[in-house]
């Protein structure tokens, strides 16, 4: 498992896929071609690990992803709990199945942020339930994109 903020795509255009892996659903988000903005794309209904991986591979092909970013639900103190261990198992299976970087980020409070984002956008409460997983994936991916951009800009030489 790695949080690789310095990953730079060698293929054009840049395309990152973000995943919020839950017990029942996997939220999916994608980046724009510049790696600036994340947008929720959809949801994968979980069935079995091989089927889930196949569905993620389909999203990778569809989006021509150059990197996959998966949120790890660490506990408030940063430690790994039972849900994080489940997601880590998923990440290992995904890494074995795809030929591109799979990186992880701490997704602590991503669902809270996603709920707030949906409320601020004026999405009715009933409609939020259908969108929360993909919005959480977008929050996870946006976190990685922002950290990556900040990391790259802080390494730029001062002029």
From Swiss-Prot:
The keyword DNA damage does not apply. One of its GO terms (biological process) is rRNA 5'-end processing. It is found in: Cytoplasm. One of its GO terms (cellular component) is cytosol. Its EC number is 3.1.-.-. One of its GO terms (molecular function) is nuclease activity. InterPro entries: RNaseH-like_sf, YqgF, YqgF/RNaseH-like_dom, YqgF/RNaseH-like_dom_sf. PANTHER family: POLYNUCLEOTIDYL TRANSFERASE, RIBONUCLEASE H-LIKE SUPERFAMILY PROTEIN (PTHR33317:SF4). Belongs to the YqgF nuclease family. This is Putative pre-16S rRNA nuclease. It comes from Synechococcus sp. (strain JA-3-3Ab) (Cyanobacteria bacterium Yellowstone A-Prime). The lineage of its organism: Bacteria, Bacillati, Cyanobacteriota, Cyanophyceae, Synechococcales.
